[in-house]
Amino acid sequence: DFIPAEGRKPGGWNFEITSEEDLNARVIRSSSCTVSIPELDLEVNPGGNATGYVTNMEGLLNRFIKIVEMVMKDLDESEKENLKTLNHMLHRLQNAGLERDGLHVELLDPHGLSQILHPDAIDRDLTDEELARLPVGPDPAVFSK
């Protein structure tokens, strides 16, 4: 995981993808970070085996695309409404930065180790409500003598 030298407080980062250039924004996601795309009602929470990673917005969106495609493969023909919704999500994710409508990405990290490195990225404190509902990712290893 990525641990900065200075102490961090719980925080969130918001970023709107409005151009192709925005896809190059650097993303640092720690193992305790929840990533969401509110317009599409998509959210990835850290699990017990979560690891951190460094990528850019395009790489982050590609992770969501793979998940949506995987869910689509598991649907049968009787689930046409769900398939329509997933196709819409896929289209928005694949065309982020190319269309008029922006796409918001939000990082919520109770440990404060995640960041979006771009001049237009907005950092903020997490609300008490967010802190109460957010998972914190894997438990650190504890060693005894």
Residue ranges and their predicted role:
Residues 1-2:
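N-terminal cysteine/histidine-rich coordination modules
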Residues 6-145:
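Long C-terminal interaction/binding lobes of large macromolecular proteins
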